[in-house]
Amino acid sequence: MPRTSPLTALTLAAALALSTSPALAGSKSSDHGHSHSHDDHAHDHSQDDKAEAIYKGYFDDADIAPRPLSDWQGEWQSLYPYLQDGTLDPVMAHKAEGGDKSAADNRAYYDTGYATDVDRITIAGDTVTFTSASATLTGTYASDGYEILTYAKGNRGVRYIFAKTEGDADAPAYIQFSDHRIAPEPADHYHLYWGNDRAALLDEVTNWPTYYPAGLSGAAIVAEMLAH
């Protein structure tokens, strides 16, 4: 896919989950897509189990619903600078404790995954602003449906897509969100993929710039990531 960046030599992105990036096996288009106490307690556990399954990429098509851009409203910061300056080292070490990669291997993996020169993203209404050290670009975006992605591992993800309707010429024609949710709900972090080729963006599996609320400190982000 094209790697041309709307902001200098920006690396473009595509599909994936937050903590792992399984190889993409294929994708499928979708929509442009009574007693209380004990029973309630069991119901709560059932809902928790379902939410966890969805987070891991296991869900029914019937559970998927369109989402508005307002789910990602706000000011967001890239994780990439925190990886580069060592703030995320405790996270890399924690992943190594329960996985088959060393902390150094994890850091190299995420160095590719998080890589981007877009340090800030602001989403207000239907307007998205991309800020890097060298440029600020703004576009107005409208929903262009969603795509269901199937990974080699067998789990799936839903990519929510928005198309530019007006704005700076160099602002990307498409932006695609992935945040482990499949129905309307405010995001607490997300991967954002952007570029000018809608279909090609779905094939990228190595670079997935990841954003957390701009108001969080590096230490707060580390604590949140370690809690998952």
Sequence positions of predicted segments:
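Amphipathic/hydrophobic helical signal segments and adjacent flexible N-terminal regions
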Residues: 2-8, 14, 22-77, 81-103, ...
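Short amphipathic alpha-helical surface micro-motifs
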Residues: 52-60, 103-104, 111-113, 141-145, ...
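Short, hydrophobic/aromatic-rich segments at coil-to-beta transitions
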Residues: 75, 124-129, 156-160
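A mature extracytoplasmic/lumenal domain signature
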Residues: 80-83, 127, 132-134, 145, ...
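A charged, solvent-exposed segment within the mature domains of Sec-exported extracytoplasmic proteins
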Residues: 141-216
